[in-house]
């Protein structure tokens, strides 16, 4: 094997902007715009909702907060238990703990690195909600997980941070559960 060095560095976590993007941000700031109330946010929310095929889209500052807000929206409180896969970004479990709720960690399938219907069924009665993480766009039997959650009247929160633009059986990931979260953090994929 030969190691090939790239001529251009591709930053993984450090922001990388084109001159057009940098100038647009500069122009916005110089026009008196607040960085925390970016007037183009509503436009982005509308365009993302249309792209994914959903009614509502709300931007927040990070993925942990997005998952916490989603859990609040489906009724999770400090006394709740939430099924969380063991193989995920720590933010998934941290979002549960941020609300004072208890994560119930479960193993993932070897073939997909995500929770399986069998795992969900084995734990569904002991939890108040299920978080499904479509890690690296790898999904299998999601419709069965949706069915189990509906049967037991447990909300399904989709952590689709790594699946923006991906589909499963022709349907956009992030549209199967009761609510979903996405992320624009640099390690996450967009398709």
Residue ranges and their predicted role:
Residues 158-191:
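Conserved active-site segment immediately N-terminal to the catalytic lysine
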Residues 34-81, 95-98, 105-107, 171:
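Phosphate-binding glycine-rich loop
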Residues 1-34:
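N-terminal "arm"/small-domain region of PLP-dependent enzymes with the aminotransferase-like
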Residues 72-160, 167:
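PLP-dependent aminotransferase-like
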Residues 15, 107, 135, 183-186:
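Conserved donor-binding loops in enzymes that form glycosidic bonds
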């Amino acid at each position: 094997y030969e190691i090939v060095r790239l001529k251009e560095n591709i930053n993984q976590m450090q922001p990388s902007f084109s001159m057009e993007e940098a100038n647009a941000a500069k122009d916005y700031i110089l026009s008196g715009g607040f960085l925390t109330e970016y007037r183009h946010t509503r436009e982005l929310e509308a365009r993302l909702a249309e792209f994914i095929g959903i009614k509502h889209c709300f931007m927040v500052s990070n993925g942990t907060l997005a998952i916490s807000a989603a859990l609040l929206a489906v009724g999770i409180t400090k006394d709740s238990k939430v099924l969380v896969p063991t193989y995920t970004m720590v933010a998934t479990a941290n979002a549960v703990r941020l609300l004072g709720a208890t994560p119930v960690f479960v193993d993932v399938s070897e073939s997909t690195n995500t929770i399986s219907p069998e795992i969900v069924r084995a734990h569904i009665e002991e939890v108040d909600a299920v978080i499904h993480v479509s890690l690296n766009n790898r999904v299998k039997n999601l419709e069965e997980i949706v069915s189990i959650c509906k049967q037991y009247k447990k909300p399904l929160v989709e952590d689709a941070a790594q699946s923006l633009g991906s589909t499963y059986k022709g349907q956009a990931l992030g549209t199967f559960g009761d609510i979903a979260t996405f992320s624009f953090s640099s390690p996450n994929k967009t398709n």
